[in-house]
Amino acid sequence: MASTFIPGLNPQNPHYIPGYTGHCPLLRFSMGQTYGQMTGQLLRGSPGLAWPPAHRTLLPPIQPPRSPEPRRRSLPVRPGHERLSSSMVPGYTGFVPQAQFIFAKNCSQVWAEALNGFTQRNGGQGSQELPKEAKGEKDVEKDQEPKPEVEKEPELGQEAEQASPYSMDDRDPRKFFMSGFTGYVPRARFLFGSSFPVLSNQALQEFGEMKSPGRSQKDPKHLPALSRTYPQHLGLLPKYGGYVPGYKFQFGRTYGHLTQDALGLSTLQKQLLV
């Protein structure tokens, strides 16, 4: 019976001393006794939930279903797995398989037990296998050259579906981006006053004309005039919460006159009036 107890505990009176920070299952549901008496009572019982996971099995081992599988060949060991077999010091932050299911032990014991269990379950380091059909056959004769595969030409319909609005012709009605597009649209930052599809179409056409000046000279396309956000001949109503360029430099008149002066006159006209 003494061999069934956890290593490091007294077989005659097994218990945890107060200050033990490990996990003791069922302790939170027990009361009325001291910490040592309660843990001793739980540990002296039959191997169950009170025992650490290393000395009990909650579920039977799960076996994979037997199915006809192709013959497999072992792959060579990858160099990255050698770090798990080396002596790891406390503070190692890498991943150790199955280490999160072991408690009440120091780092070295947890890692050693986790690696041993993982190696046994997977049949050693050479357990990595590859199906036979997935591995290329190396019995091809050297004189026999593989025939070049004929590349299938993509259909015109597929090319049209995969075409980007950047490369479409200016007359293509699909040369625009849908609302919500977060990519970069050249020249779009200088346009406003319309929906995003219309703005993106105008921006792409303008960018295409700037990129190919010879084409724009042969077939010039005049873009429509941009609509203005502010009226130039009328002032704005009081309590307008938007930004009015040049308004903060105006003073001495009503809000309507000041906004009219700021928006309706050019910089040269303002300098002449002063």
Curated annotation (Swiss-Prot):
Expressing tissues: Expressed in trachea multiciliated cells.
Subcellular localization: Cytoplasm, Cytoskeleton, Cilium axoneme; Cytoplasm, Cytoskeleton, Flagellum axoneme
Primary location group: cytoplasm
Cellular component aspect of the GO annotation: axonemal microtubule; motile cilium
Region (Disordered): 46-89, 119-171
Keywords: Cell projection, Cilium, Cytoplasm, Cytoskeleton, Flagellum
Biased composition (Basic and acidic residues): 130-155
Keyword hit for Hydrolase: no
Keyword Ion transport: no
Pfam families (alphabetical): CMI2B-like
Assembly and oligomerization: Microtubule inner protein component of sperm flagellar doublet microtubules.
Physiological role: Microtubule inner protein (MIP) part of the dynein-decorated doublet microtubules (DMTs) in cilia axoneme, which is required for motile cilia beating.
PANTHER family attached to this UniProt entry: CAT EYE SYNDROME CRITICAL REGION PROTEIN 6, PROTEIN FAM166B
Family membership: Belongs to the CIMIP2 family.
Protein name, entry field: Ciliary microtubule inner protein 2B
